[in-house]
From Swiss-Prot:
Purpose: Component of the Mediator complex, a coactivator involved in the regulated transcription of nearly all RNA polymerase II-dependent genes. Mediator functions as a bridge to convey information from gene-specific regulatory proteins to the basal RNA polymerase II transcription machinery. Mediator is recruited to promoters by direct interactions with regulatory proteins and serves as a scaffold for the assembly of a functional preinitiation complex with RNA polymerase II and the general transcription factors.
Gene label: rgr1
Amino acid composition bias (Polar residues), ranges on this chain: 20-39, 1088-1099
GO molecular function, one term: transcription coregulator activity
Origin species: Aspergillus clavatus (strain ATCC 1007 / CBS 513.65 / DSM 816 / NCTC 3887 / NRRL 1 / QM 1276 / 107)
Name of this chain's protein: Mediator of RNA polymerase II transcription subunit 14
Length: 1112
């Protein structure tokens, strides 16, 4: 049995004589080749068995290796022994050896595999169970090893069990081997019987050709001798007469009548055959676009069949049916159909033949195209009677093809059609079947190239039309800002184009290459991007075309915008240097954007030009710069915006097509002016939005370019009470906080100062109460403040780099303006002459004839750099950032110049609510005394050494020191008899010096014990009113002047040359009394006399308020 392992002891080995039933020799069988017919061969079988397969073994239909005892058979020796089959057998020992060798190899691999598994030497040892048996190492690696060993043992055990079964079976396989031999013998005999039958049949067939009829010598002899055979009957046929032309014509007319009558009265003519004509003895049926068929009859009987005469095809390209076998076969087939099925059967056969012929012609044309110009782009396949042509084969995505086949049923839109099969076209475009009625498919004039061009033209028209519809919905094209035109053609694909205007000066032509289907984009005047402009073999879907056109339009728009702004000095900012992605703040429809920055701007602000098919926009983007240390390091880098974080972004214009308008009709500087203005306005609006407590209009999202690229104004609600505490000015107590300005201030952008590289803002506001005098009083030297002629509105100029807010400066200026207006109102109420006004000072005139001039300064003390503070820091502060400081100045000829420091201290006193009234009262009260002192000190007629020094303690306390006599006098203001008066007393140690007795005696006579106009002696001093103090000071000085003249005449006393230096002044202050005590005294003296000066003397006199004046 082939494939069964036989034991050598029973199969394939020598047999004992007792085991052979036919007494065959027990020697090994001779190795001879015997075929199935019993013929012995000469070639010896020298095949060697390897692993159960015989080298050079033959198949079942070939010779079989057998063993026979002898070449011939002798009947006296009995029947021959059956051929013994050994093909496919191999020794059992070979299988055992191979199994053992395989087991050894697998065991070696197992050992190698187990050695590669590392077992941890310090595995966790579980505790000993109660039975005392240790479970051993239970680590996963050790368990894996054990599992592999068990699997190997089970597998090999199963294999050796199979070997054991085979070994037991092979010891009893002798009977099976004999059965195999018997079966082989029966098969050989059956095959020999079948071969005999085949040979008999072949012989019978071959003998047919060898048959020869017996010769009819009698008939042959009669024919040769008499020329006829009497035994053959004469049918009586006569030879036809020669047919003349007239007879032929007559017979043709007769046939015509027969055919006409038959077709008109008897035969059923199918609808396609109803167009016919009878002529020349035949009927010619015309099937439009297919063929002309000539039929005729052979008998007059109405039931006789028509016979085929000729056929001519009416479509092109076509050819006549060649004479010969094809024509004869066609004649037979048509006549058979006419005989069996009449005219209808004939039409059905020829109609199907023509349709198949047309499909074949189209197939040949398509193959020729695929081998020629359309190579690699067409795929042609003929399935039964359906032609499939795939075009644009190299395109990715959904495929497109056409199917031309025979379709049964009624034609669409043909009422008269009787359901005859026709040549139909099926169009699958991008994987979807579409209507093919618009395809130019002429079944009469077959042209595959024309059909393909029509199909491709319709496909391209569909793509471009869909692209046009999508793009025309975008705002740029829908509103007519950009032109869009689609040129479509249903027959010629090369004439299908989409013309799109990218910018004012650039246009794009979109077409699709007919053969390959590649998108071709060509820009005019020049290609923008080679990767975008060249043809692409990617899938030409509508979305892809729209995407590429949109991308090119955005590239063109940004190119023009970038080239324009670079001329204006803008620099490009790389988005890669920013920490955050700018696209996060931009709408998702933005396809391209570019970032720009101007050197005049703050680094925290940039602009972005964005472009999409819905419109082009300018954006203002706010950046958060790194820390101060990082910023200083970045200053050395070329990219100053690196590592900046994007905070916010707002659109400022929905188009920058005006860039071309500016370039054509205006100067480039206008664009820089507009963008800088929008950056500046947005910086201030963003600052106000972060403050949250100050309302403004319009909101950030509405701050956009107005008509004519005008920068919008910012309306800010100004109300001091709603301002953050840090931005509220701390006014001196003497300046009343009164509202003068209406609560809406308009901040407008007024250009750029190119020299100082700053943006000019103008804040426009209105006053609650008009003051007509303001317009003429504003100083022309200060251009930061202007009042309208009616005096009801004002304008304040503010300067700052673009991107830095002026909000703090605005609120500071407005509050300073209110302070200035408060001072103006006070001076006007006091009927003082105001000469000029500005935010920093108020100049006025006073005195009896308004001959004295004074300037009141409005200064500012900043606790920190408020311009650099973040709004969050401002909101977090509870203390004010700005302190308003008032000062007063006099010219060098004004007698009040000595007390301007003291007056400034009074103006800025934190608790003196009547400081302005106090200063006005002091100016009026001290003017006579100051003038007298000024007259004495300004007497330069004599070149004398200095004899008098005047030390100003405060506005109400003066120290008069006569150097020659070492005498000091104190002139103070105090209350006397219910009114404010001047009091003169001697100050210092009551020591007697040279000449002092004489002076004191003279002073007692002329001052202390005397009375005068407006003054009165007190014994140890003098009290005088406002006007009387002039006489007191003059008499005092006259006494010292007369005493000096007497001393110089007698020569008794030498003048003291020592002057009172600053140290003496200081010692004198410390020795007598401090300034605060003196001021308190002065205040108590003035309080009962003037209600307006009730608290004017409660401020300290600083050291710088003391003026030392030396009299020459």
């Amino acid at each position: 049995m082939p494939g069964v392992v036989m034991d050598n002891a029973t199969v394939g080995g020598p047999r004992r004589a007792s085991e052979s039933p036919d007494n065959v020799s027990s020697t090994p069988f001779p190795q001879e080749r015997v075929n199935q017919s019993g013929d012995s061969g000469d070639r010896r079988n020298r095949s060697i068995f390897h692993n159960g397969a015989v080298k050079g073994a033959q198949g079942p239909g070939q010779h079989i290796e057998t063993h026979t005892g002898k070449d011939g058979i002798n009947e006296s020796e009995g029947l021959p022994e059956l051929a013994h089959i050994t093909q496919g057998f191999f020794p059992f020992s070979t299988l055992v050896n191979r199994s053992v060798q395989q087991c050894w190899n697998d065991l070696s691999e197992l050992v190698t595999e187990l050695a590669a598994i590392q077992v941890s030497p310090h595995g966790q040892m579980p505790s000993t169970p109660a039975n005392g048996k240790a479970p051993g190492d239970q680590s996963p690696e050790n368990l894996q090893k054990k599992t592999r060993i068990l699997d190997f043992a089970h597998a090999k055990r199963a294999e050796f069990i199979k070997l054991l079964v085979l070994s037991q079976w092979s010891r009893q396989a002798g009977d099976v081997s004999r059965l195999i031999d018997l079966q082989n013998f029966i098969r050989n005999r059956h095959q020999a019987f079948m071969d005999a039958l085949q040979r008999i049949g072949d012989m019978k067939r071959d003998l047919v050709q060898a048959q020869v009829a017996n010769p009819d010598l009698k008939t042959a002899l009669e024919v040769l001798s008499k020329g006829r055979v009497v035994s053959i009957t004469d049918l009586g046929y006569e030879a036809p007469k020669q047919l003349t032309a007239k007879g032929a014509l007559k017979r043709l007319h007769k046939i015509n009548r027969i055919i006409s009558a038959r077709l008109a009265l008897h035969d059923t003519i199918p609808r396609p055959f109803r167009t016919y004509r009878v002529h020349d003895g035949r009927a010619t049926f015309v099937v439009q676009g297919e063929f002309e068929l000539d039929l005729s009859v052979g008998e007059e009987s109405k039931s006789s069949q028509f016979f085929f005469v000729d056929i001519r095809f009416l479509f092109s390209p076509s050819s006549h049916v060649p004479k010969g076998r094809l024509s004869n076969e066609l004649d037979v087939q048509v006549n058979d159909r006419l005989r069996d099925n009449g005219l209808k059967g004939c039409f059905d056969f020829l109609h199907g033949l023509v349709l198949t012929n047309k499909i074949t012609i189209l197939f040949k044309q398509a193959v020729e195209l695929a081998r020629g110009l359309w190579s690699d782009v067409l795929r042609v396949e003929l399935l039964h009677r359906t032609l499939v042509v795939q075009y644009w084969a190299l395109k990715l995505g959904a495929k497109s093809w056409i199917e031309i086949g025979i379709k049964s049923g009624r034609k669409p839109h043909d009422v008269k059609d009787s359901g005859v099969p026709y040549l139909a076209l099926r169009w699958i475009r991008d994987g979807q079947e579409v209507d093919s009625t618009s395809v130019e498919f002429d079944a009469d004039d077959l042209s595959m190239e024309r059909l393909l061009r029509s199909i491709i033209a319709l496909h391209i028209s569909h793509l471009l039309s869909a692209t046009y519809s999508i793009l025309n919905q975008r705002s740029l094209f829908a509103t007519g800002l950009l032109s869009l035109q689609a040129l479509l053609n249903t027959n010629e694909p090369g004439k299908c184009q989409l013309l799109a205007q990218l910018t004012v000066s650039r246009h794009l032509r979109v077409s699709i290459e007919p053969m390959s289907g590649a998108i071709v984009l060509s820009a005019d005047p020049s290609p923008l991007d080679r990767s975008e402009s060249d043809s692409s073999l990617e899938k030409s879907s509508v979305d892809d075309i729209v995407s590429r056109v949109s991308r090119l339009r955005c590239i063109a728009a940004l190119e023009e915008a970038e080239s324009t702004v670079k001329i204006l000095g803008f620099e490009t900012v790389s988005p890669r240097g920013l920490k955050a992605d700018v696209r996060k703040i931009l709408p998702p429809n933005i396809l391209r954007f570019a970032l720009f920055w101007h050197p005049f701007w703050d680094r925290s602000w940039i602009v972005a030009a964005t472009s999409s098919t819905d419109g082009d926009s300018w954006w203002v983007i706010h950046l958060r710069r790194p820390s101060a240390l990082a910023t200083s390091a970045l200053n050395l880098d070329k990219d100053i915006h690196r590592e900046a974080t994007v905070c916010s972004g707002h659109v400022i214009s929905n188009t920058f097509l005006a860039v071309q308008h500016l370039a054509r009709d205006s100067s480039f500087a206008d664009l820089s002016h507009c963008l800088s203005g929008m950056v500046a306005i947005h910086a201030n609006a963003s600052y106000l939005a972060d403050l949250r407590s100050v309302a403004f209009q319009p909101p950030l999202r509405a701050l956009k370019f107005e008509s004519g690229l005008e920068v919008p104004n910012l309306l800010v609600r100004y109300q001091v009470s709603t301002l953050p505490r840090a931005l509220q000015l701390v006014f001196p107590a003497g300046v009343g906080k009164k509202d003068f300005i209406r609560n809406t201030v308009r901040v407008a952008f007024h250009g750029i100062d190119q020299r100082r590289k700053v943006v000019i803002f103008v804040a426009y506001g209105n006053l609650l109460v008009p003051m007509k005098e303001l317009s003429t009083l504003v100083s022309k030297l200060d251009g930061s403040l202007v009042f309208k002629q009616e005096g009801d509105s004002f304008a304040i100029r503010l300067l700052a780099p673009a991107g830095q807010p002026v909000i703090v400066q605005l609120f500071e200026s407005l509050q300073r303006l209110e302070c200035m207006l408060s001072i103006f109102e006070f001076l006007r109420r006091k009927k003082l002459v105001i000469r000029s006004l500005s935010l920093s000072q108020v100049a006025f005139a006073y005195g009896p004839r308004r001959s004295l001039a004074a300037v009141m300064d409005i200064g500012m003390s900043k606790l920190s750099n408020s311009e650099q503070l973040d709004p969050v820091d401002i909101l977090a502060r509870t203390d004010p950032l700005l302190l308003l400081r008032l000062g007063i100045r006099f010219d060098h000829s004004n007698p009040h110049r000595r007390i301007q420091g003291s007056l400034a201290a009074i103006l800025n006193h934190t608790s003196n609510k009547a400081a302005l009234d106090s200063v006005a009262e002091i100016l009026s009260f001290t003017l006579p005394a100051m003038r007298t002192l000024d007259q004495i000190t300004s007497n330069l007629s004599r070149g004398e050494p200095a004899r008098l020094q005047v030390v100003v303690r405060n506005a109400f306390t003066f120290l008069l020191h006569y150097i020659n006599y070492a005498l000091r006098f104190e002139l103070t203001a105090s209350q006397h008899a219910g009114r404010l008066t001047w009091v003169l007393r001697e100050s210092g140690d009551p020591q007697v010096g040279p000449g002092q007795d004489q002076i004191r005696a003279k002073l007692r006579d002329t001052l202390y014990n005397s009375n005068g106009n407006g003054w009165k002696g007190l014994g140890n001093g003098v009290v005088a009113d406002v006007e009387g103090v002039c006489s007191v000071i003059s008499n005092l000085d006259t006494s010292f002047a007369g005493a000096r003249d007497n001393q110089e005449t007698s020569g008794d006393v030498k003048p003291t040359e020592r002057s009172l230096n600053q140290t003496d002044v200081k010692n004198h202050r410390d020795h007598d009394f401090d300034a605060q005590a003196a001021m308190d005294y002065d205040t108590s003296a003035v309080a009962t006399n003037s209600a307006g000066a009730r608290s004017s003397q409660q401020c300290d006199a600083p050291p710088e308020a003391a003026d030392v004046i030396t009299i020459d």
